Amino acid sequence: MSHTDDGALVRETIRAIRSEKSPSGGKSPEGQTPELFRGIRLGALAPLLAPYARAAKGGTGSLEKPKKCTLICCADHGVAEMQVSAYPPETTAQMTANYLLAKGAVANALAAFAKSDLFVADLGIKAPLPPLPALIDCKIAPGTKNSAKGPAMTREEALRSLATGIRLADRLAAEGYRCFLPGEMGISNTTASAAIAASLCRLTPEEATGRGTNISDERLKTKIEVVRQILAVNRPDAADGIDVLQKVGGFELGCIAGLILGAAQKKAVVILDGFNTGAAALIAAALAPAVRDFLLPSHLAAEPAHKAILRKLRLTPCMDMRFRLGEATGSSIVADFLDAAIEAVQAAEPDRPETKGSESAAIRERKAPAQEGADIEKCLTQPRSLRENAPQDAALSLPEPPALDEGAMDACQKRIDSLAKPIYSLGRLEELAVRLAGVTGEARPSLSTRRALLVFATEEPSPRRAQLAKAFAAHAEAPVTLALLDAKSSVAEAFAFGQEAARSLAEDCPLLGISFAQQTDEAAKENAALWKEALHRIKADDTLLALLHSLPPALRLEAAALSGAISGAAACRTLVLLDDAATESAAHAIEILAPAFAPFLLHVQSDFLALSLHASCGIAASLGLRLIDAALHMANDMKTFAETAVAVAADGPGKGRQG
């Protein structure tokens, strides 16, 4: 196909996108508040669902999970000769072979996690490749030119890279894919992305440039000066996205920009990953601003300019995992969250039959005689009668926290460091795997690690809230237990009830989500405000009894039950996933009194996922379990540098440690 055809295709695609009326019309999802989707409060998940629903069926009709594909675009960069990366240029070819032969990259592991089909395309790999039958050959040239000395490519090559992405989108859409997860592999591509971000977001080289593959301080200084030189030599025109791509970009970045254009034309959504896909999206949005209606965010990358990129694209990330890797890592996790949210909406549809035969799809309940006849199958109900041997307030105390298995943690971290990726590039995903290794005593915790969800409440959740809790828990393969508190019980009884409920589940579950169900977001917000004020008054030398009695009366029983459950589960060597403000606040109180509990407690919403779920009822904890599943896929499915024959780091903290 001729260069003229490439240019014509790009122009026609842009024209088609511009001629379409914006599907969002500039309004909030479904015309409601940003946290609502079809009347269901889903926090930050609603802005993920709404664009997909609009793209799929105009926001009407039954919503189905999309067929997903991960496309890794590979190309080399001439600017690599300026020594701006921790890895040699031939790593691009080696990783391409890894995707298709050894299948041991994070792209392989997380595509499997997200149930996304993996494709790999060669846009401009310089080094020789072994026979790779599954490789999509779209080579434009053997790498770009050194952009520190002049334009990275010709305008014709820039158009070719965009047209290639459009054609790939057309091909994949024809095969039924409605959700694209682009990723990229190209040594020194964060240098190109920094130059793009500086051009289109009006950033200085210092603001735009980060450590990429975790380079040393000295090499970072070099990289910043190289970006400064790239911008000075080329003077890219921010009003012309093609000019920016031509002068400072890369073939794989142009292809991803084209994929975004093609997806928008085909009414498919693209889940952006990190810094590099964000830079490619800037190019696409510069050419056709309406593509933003088809872009979904995933995470905030470790690169400093990524925040400015997301702001320019009007996207809000839903997690900060400190990733510095671009193989559709964060987007794979968010694609799984999208599936979970769709399953929940399906469960809430009145005419859809409930899924049968799944233990994790039911809420287990044991009824007290006064509460017989409710819908939920089984729950734990706090005894109402005060017995002679009932626990007394004076007996309240936290159990002794166990120690993590440091040997297993060290072995787990050592293996993660040797996996074929830049060292520490998977950020908090690595932290989760190592933490779970310490809990279980296994250097490689199993993909089938058992889990459960424990939901406390003072009254049964509404049918819709119960449906949502069940759907998200089923997605995480976590059986749900509802524990109903008795408002007439003492603080000591509530503590003992919570402790017993958690211990009964933690005996064979290394993972336990704990939630306190509120009936409304407003009630949850009021509860959170009370907790926030109370936490300021807690002192490290307080006793548990003094702490509980210092709380407002409205918080005492829930605090007692949650304290019992959280400490009881942790004492059983279980990793506790805290679901909402109430559980996180109770955990903070425990951490103040007994800091040794902290390694067993995961604050899902405040530390990992920006979900804006107030009355979560287990949703956040369930998604936290899926985050751990992603970490387990990383730890179990990825392969080492030695197993994949990929070059190790020659600079930065990975030098001498990887292998």
Language model segments and positions:
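N-terminal loops that bind phosphate or other acidic moieties
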Residues: 2-366, 372-383, 387-659
